[in-house]
From Swiss-Prot:
This is Pyridoxine/pyridoxal/pyridoxamine kinase. HAMAP family: PdxK. One of its GO terms (cellular component) is cytosol. It holds the Pfam family Phos_pyr_kin. InterPro entries: PdxK, PM/HMP-P_kinase-1, PyrdxlKinase, Ribokinase-like. Mg(2+) binds at Y136, E162.
Length: 283
């Protein structure tokens, strides 16, 4: 078969259920390096678009790499359309973004994409920082999230610190966190999943809060003491997979949390510093 046929017949193009836009590492299990295999375990097709490419996370004594240049990043997105690979696209997820300009480029691409995919689910994990570390992204990223990505998202998955940054409100107790989340809801943004709400430290519990216009659901999970990285990326991968498989939002959040706990325990049993995905049948 000639290469002309192989590479010019768009009817033969691979198709994606999900485009996942976030960080990638050569060594380790964060960003798309954990999200892609997790999504594939759920029987879904995913294309990974990197925002940064690093040798490993900065928690090691050496690391190399950095943000993907804007020209490359916009080209990665454009190429998916040029290859006609998005006919069956159902969702786009975002995680760690390297620069504010990437967020603007992504928002423009999503806006154009929506013209042909009116039912597209856009889920944004607004990676900004956490209570322990503060802001660990470039200082212009929070405003870029507010200006460009939040108006396009159907759902977002901030932690408490990120919710505070996005809303400018104190969220250190459950009621204030719920109120802050509700302040973000709009005709487009239908739900907020707060991934680190106030839990019961004495009972070793953590809480995930699912907030929509007409309901609030608090989901409690066991707390696993660990410094493992990438658990939030894994959670979002499991969440979007559950939603695309037809699970209700609260059920998908609950199942995603349970899967993350299973993976963390499995990783600890294997004495690894990086997340290891067990087969779903063993989880």
């Amino acid at each position: 078969m000639s290469s002309l046929l192989l590479f010019n017949d768009k009817s033969r193009a691979l198709q994606a259920d999900i485009v996942a836009v976030q960080s990638q590492v050569v060594y380790g299990s964060v960003g798309n390096s954990i999200a892609v295999p997790a999504i594939k375990q759920n029987g879904l097709n995913v294309f990974a678009v990197p925002t940064v490419l690093l040798s490993n996370t900065p928690h090691y004594d050496t690391f190399y790499g950095g943000a993907i240049p804007d020209e490359w990043f916009s080209g990665y997105l454009r190429a998916l359309q040029e290859r006609d690979a998005l006919r069956q696209l159902r969702a786009v997820t975002t995680g760690y973004m390297g620069t504010a300009s990437q967020i603007k480029i992504l928002a423009e691409w999503l806006t154009a994409l929506r013209k042909d995919h009116s039912d597209l689910l856009i889920m944004v994990d607004p990676v900004i920082g956490d209570i322990d570390s503060g802001i660990y992204v470039k200082p212009d990223l929070p405003e870029a999230y507010r200006q460009y990505l939040l108006p396009l998202a159907q759902g977002i998955t901030p932690n408490i610190f990120e919710l505070e940054i996005l809303t400018g409100k104190n969220c250190r107790d459950l009621d204030s966190a719920i109120a802050a989340a509700k302040s973000l809801l709009s005709d487009t943004l239908k739900w907020v999943v707060i991934t680190s709400a106030s839990g019961n430290e004495e009972n070793q519990e953590m809480q995930v809060v699912v907030v929509s216009a007409d309901s609030v659901n608090v989901i409690s999970h066991s707390r696993v003491k660990t410094d493992l990285k990438g658990t939030g990326d894994l959670f979002c991968a499991q969440l979007i997979s559950g939603l695309l498989k037809g699970e209700a939002l609260t059920d998908a959040v609950h199942r995603a949390g349970l899967r993350v706990l299973e993976v963390m325990r499995y990783t600890q049993q294997h004495e690894s510093d990086e997340l290891i995905l067990p087969p779903l049948a063993e989880a």
